[in-house]
Amino acid sequence: MSGGDKRQPEVNIGVVGHVDHGKTTLVQALTGVWTMRHSEEIRRGMTIKLGYADGEVWECEGCGFPERFSPEPVCECDPQASASLRRRVSYVDAPGHEILMATMLSGAALMDGALLVVAANEPCPQPQTKEHLVALEIIGIKNIVIVQNKVDVVSRERAKESYQEILNFIKGTIAEGSPIIPVSALKRANIDAVLAAIEKFIPTPPRDLDKPPVMYISRSFDVNRPGTPPERLVGGVVGGSIIQGVFRVGDEIEISPGVAVRKPGGRVEYVRLHTTITSLRFGSIEVEEARPGGLVAIGTQLDPSVTKADNLVGNVVGKPGELPEPLTTLRIEHHLLEKVVGMKEEARVEPIRRGEMLMLSVGTAITLGVVTRAGKDEIEVQLRRPVVTWPKARVALSRRIMGRWRLIGWGLIK
């Protein structure tokens, strides 16, 4: 990294695909960061929460293609040659296990593009490979690079066969025409080609800096270690992605819909939180202002007990009085898939019925709701917990089928 360069990441790239296909290992090869950080994740050997890591794309003009691209400022052609920093990138490592699909969907709301990881040593597609690709389509992510991983553990013939399986799988989908890069993430082979594809196929989208600032919260923490003296305690931290506008250190902010408070008689109300930004960080980089692009950690004056253990995931951050009112009822213009995805056996998607329970993914919020009205093209859903959203925002719809929440369609909020 070049010493004083404090550029924030410009783009969020999701890393998606079936469980054990090497997503976390790929992120480590691209960034040097192992995103599986929680004790339960390490014990089970799988990503449970969204993992984040910031990486860099360096380019040496003196090298050939694609070896001119590297995640580090080092050069193959000449150790003394200076590479230039093209971009900083935030990677969102989404869990590939079927029981964690809701977590993947909340991460998809933050993504500008995606790396779809497919292991060459298993037939393609696997159930969550299918489900994740449909999720990208539902959320509207068109910039996709396919990473054919684990080519080092298969024969040349199997690698070619796997490549053909991938081509057949993506035909007619949003990923048709996407580049397919064979790699060994474990041995860091062909990582330069992945970076070259990222530069070409996942551009930094235009950002609107003049609108009121808005951020989706996808993680929240208490960063104080046990035993920290009271005078050294710092406020709670919320992490996520800024969608529009600019946040600055010292800004007053509102977090909505806030936290659930039980009132006398057992009624639950949501109370918005108001606080001040004390710090802004992108990975190890501390900045005075943060714009869209990358995953930012906002330090606040909130009591850390409020933010610990992802308590505020699904909330939205804005300036006081500038966020829309939280909604407990949504009218959705919906579109159903033909078939349920993520299951080994194919099943038709039945029409949505009045009275049934659905799981809705709205931004980074995951909430359950009961269908109170079901028309041919429009449904109305009464939510268990309120959400902050905008007209025409996309919503992913899931239904409980054989004990698991399965993607069945998507919609636009009216």
Swiss-Prot record:
GO CC terms: cytosol
Region (G5): 184-186
Class in the EC hierarchy, top level: hydrolase
Keywords: GTP-binding, Hydrolase, Initiation factor, Magnesium, Metal-binding, Nucleotide-binding, Protein biosynthesis, Zinc
InterPro entries (UniProt xref): eIF2G, eIF2g_C, eIF2g_dom_2, eIF2g_GTP-bd, P-loop_NTPase, Small_GTP-bd, T_Tr_GTP-bd_dom, TIF2_gsu
GO-annotated biological processes: formation of translation preinitiation complex
PROSITE patterns with a match to the protein in the record: G_TR_2
Region of interest: G1: 17-24
Name used for this protein in its record: Translation initiation factor 2 subunit gamma
Source organism per UniProt: Aeropyrum pernix (strain ATCC 700893 / DSM 11879 / JCM 9820 / NBRC 100138 / K1)
High-level lineage: Archaea, Thermoproteota, Thermoprotei, Desulfurococcales, Desulfurococcaceae
